[in-house]
Amino acid sequence: MNAPSTATELSPARQPDVPVDRRQRQALVVGALTPLLPAHALLWQREDTVPYECDGLTAYRELPLAVALPETEAQLAAVLAACHRLGVPVVARGAGTGLSGGATPHAQGVTLSLAKFNRIVRVDPVSRTAVVQSGVRNAAISEAAARHGLYYAPDPSSKIACTIGGNVAENSGGMHCLKYGLTIHNVLRVRGYTVEGEAVEFGSEALDAAGL
């Protein structure tokens, strides 16, 4: 005997009414994000967003509706959550040195700059590990580790300017990757946020951890 079954009609989750017109959509986004960020941490005027229209892949350019520059994780999470509620795409950006278009803005979205997350939390010479925020420059990690006779191996040609967050996103390498591997082989733990603004962590700082 077959178990009874019921066919039901499924409706898509209701999305907020977001205007299609760019100016109206921009006004809605700016209105939602302004209370979440400090003054001057939200850019939407054309002259302010032009510097963010592309990354190192300059053949493709697009102006975002706005550029958010949060300073704390709470602000970052709030921006992501607000954009998610509005159904607005978010593109994260480090230093914009990538050549694969990973930071190319979405014309109907928000560019989320991580430039202000530029703190080196600690360097542990005993375990030979460092905890840094995503906006720290690649070269700055080696500079901080140099006093302990150490350095961070993945060294893309843009290491003076590129950030570790961008390196993780692009799995950057460099001349030392033949011996020490790519970024993925040198990162033990990553803390990030989902599009809903929820914090997530992957990996562990334990030296015997499998890594990422």
Sequence positions of predicted segments:
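FAD-binding subdomain of flavoenzyme oxidoreductases
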Residues: 119-212
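Extended, hydrophobic alpha-helical segments in both membrane/secreted and soluble proteins
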Residues: 90-92, 99, 141, 171
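Residue-level detector of anion-binding/catalytic polar loops
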Residues: 88-89, 151
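N-terminal flexible segment immediately upstream of the FAD-binding catalytic core
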Residues: 1-81, 98-128, 157, 180
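Aromatic/hydrophobic pocket-lining residues that form π-stacking "cages" and hydrophobic walls in ligand
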Residues: 79, 86, 141
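Short, basic and Ser/Thr-rich N-terminal targeting/leader segments
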Residues: 84-86, 93-95, 162, 186
